[in-house]
Amino acid sequence: MRKAERARTTNETDIKLAFEIDGEGKADISTDVPFMTHMLDLFTKHGQFNLTVDAKGDTEIDDHHTTEDIGICLGQAFLEALGDKKGIKRYGSALVPMDEALAQVAVDLSNRPHLEMRAAFPQAKVGTFDTELVHEFLWKLALEARMNLHVIVHYGTNTHHMIEAVFKALGRALDEASSIDPRVKGVPSTKGML
């Protein structure tokens, strides 16, 4: 079973998270950040993961700490759930349309954390959610999961649609990269390690 749990309690947040790679797209998400709850639900469904999140934070200030710490916990749980990475495909990508928006995500589960993001969101907020937090979440996810993550929003006019396409593509790309390929013997690297 490729799964892991994480808990993180600080003066700013209290987060409990359980993640399973080989899931059924089941999400049980409770956060103080409604837009993030929605995005995590989409990510889980499109990645065919199982994800449980209970997150509370100092959202009276803003959504930054909660969003960032969810990214940290999810990245750590994803890395642990991958185990030794033997037999995984390692690479994954997805191109996802959402009405007028088109987003592309490519990932390498390489143990070399990096985020490259090209997205010009037309609005600074979706509801009360600061759209700059999408980058913050993705960077913490990439850093803690030790993945090389590339995100491109090719175009779009509706900020909600653009971000939604990103999270759907992220789920699909990570599903592909983490899937087991029976042809792969050991870790998928000519170095013999990742």
From Swiss-Prot:
Pfam families membership? IGPD
What keywords appear on the UniProt entry?
Amino-acid biosynthesis, Cytoplasm, Histidine biosynthesis, Lyase
**What reactions does this protein catalyze?**
D-erythro-1-(imidazol-4-yl)glycerol 3-phosphate = 3-(imidazol-4-yl)-2-oxopropyl phosphate + H2O
Q: What is its EC number?
A: 4.2.1.19
Keyword Lyase appears in the UniProt entry: yes
> Where does this one sit in the cell?
Cytoplasm
Into which family does the record put it? Belongs to the imidazoleglycerol-phosphate dehydratase family.
Q: What is this protein called?
A: Imidazoleglycerol-phosphate dehydratase
Organism the protein comes from: Bacillus velezensis (strain DSM 23117 / BGSC 10A6 / LMG 26770 / FZB42)
